[in-house]
Design a protein with these regions (language model features):
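Bacterial N-terminal signal peptides that target proteins for export
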Residues: 1-9
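C-terminal segment of classical bacterial N-terminal signal peptides
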Residues: 14-23
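N-terminal (or domain-start) structured segment
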Residues: 23-109, 147, 159, 167-195, ...
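Hinge/capping helix and adjacent helix->loop/strand transition within the periplasmic-binding protein
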Residues: 25, 52-54, 76-85, 98-183, ...
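An extracytoplasmic/periplasmic, membrane-proximal ligand-sensing/linker region
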Residues: 28-30, 168-172, 255-320
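Short coil/turn segments
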Residues: 36-40, 92, 126-131, 152-157, ...
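C-terminal lobe and pocket-closing loops
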Residues: 118, 202-270, 299-302, 316-320
């Protein structure tokens, strides 16, 4: 009996040593980096993936899985093996798409590594548009409900939610149009849409080129890249909404691997090349690890659920 116990404990110790060694050696092969959107998400995602490849010593390979306001990408990562070899390039959409009914789970169905950067969501119109302030646009929208068109990235996306918060907060009832990023900007210029809610850095180029103008931004503070543009809160809308980007993995990924990913993410985000590129794009670099990001997600999720409930678009998860 004593011999059997010795063999069992010996086997357990050997297995533990093997597992510890495997974690220590991670990563031993390329890592899939799942990107849920095109446009700015794709640009930023490929940049951080490349920077992380250098830190980890293995290829971090961008893979586009676009659709459902991030639902396809997050579902894919949720269902992946929890070994750290499949990473989601998350954004605020991890909170919006999970609360609007695009997926049957909430944001806690994945493990979250941390945040890389954040940016405000601007309300954009053509430079030729008749509105020069957000109030002018919203006053017309209230006077003519279901007439003015506002384009956004897709149902459940961060731009969708920012648009809902803004219009609902000012009693505006527009026609909301789900449109891809590049097409959204073309439609602004052609007049096919009256306005758009968008990521920050791409339309900022159009503003500087004199083709578009921002009427407001969603964040709690003015952005130094566009200091003359008021926040929605300054204009009387009770909202603070940032588009963040970071990393998530399958639930149950070993803590040792998550810690390695966090360290690699922060080191890559802080690298001279990546941080310089972010500065050039006017994106706020704001890396944070698992604990700080968990607190941010919890607070942001409460805010988003409140926005959705007020707008009547919140979808509770079915109890198991």
């Amino acid at each position: 009996m004593r011999k059997l116990k010795t063999l069992v404990f010996g086997a357990m110790a050997g297995a533990l040593a093997f597992t510890t060694q495997a974690k220590a050696e991670w990563p031993e092969k390329p890592i899939q980096f799942i990107i849920p959107f095109g446009g700015g998400a794709d640009v930023e995602g490929r940049m951080i993936a490349k920077a992380m490849s250098k830190v980890l010593g293995q290829p971090v390979v961008p893979v586009s899985k676009i659709g459902g306001g991030g639902a396809i990408a997050y579902t894919y990562v949720k269902n992946s093996k929890p070994d750290g070899y499949t990473i989601a390039w998350n954004s605020t959409s991890i909170l919006t798409t999970t609360n609007i009914g695009n997926v049957p789970f909430d944001y806690t169905a994945l493990d979250h590594i941390g945040q890389v950067a954040q940016q405000p969501v601007p309300f954009v119109v053509s430079a030729k548009a008749r509105w020069n302030t957000l109030k002018e646009f919203m006053d017309e929208c209230k006077a003519k409900p279901n007439t003015l068109k506002i384009a956004f990235a897709g149902f459940g996306s961060a731009t969708h939610m920012a648009g809902v918060a803004l219009t609902n907060g000012m009693d505006c009832k527009p026609i909301m149009l789900p449109v891809k990023g590049a097409d959204r900007r073309k439609m602004i210029l052609s007049g096919e849409t009256d306005a758009a809610v968008d990521i920050f850095f791409v339309p900022l180029k159009m503003v500087k080129a004199g083709k578009s103008k921002f009427l407001a931004i969603s964040s709690g503070k003015r952005n130094p890249a566009a200091p003359n543009i008021p926040t929605a809160k300054e204009l009387g809308v009770d909202m603070e909404f940032d588009l963040f980007r970071g990393l998530s993995v399958a639930k149950g990924t070993p803590q040792a691997i998550k810690d390695k990913l966090e360290a690699a993410m922060i080191k890559a985000a802080s690298s001279k090349k990546f941080s310089g590129r972010m500065k050039k794009l006017k994106i706020t670099l704001a890396p944070m690890g698992q604990k700080q990001f968990a607190a941010k997600l919890k607070k942001a999720n409460t805010n988003i659920v409140s926005i959705m409930k007020k707008a009547g678009i919140y979808r509770a998860k079915a109890k198991k």
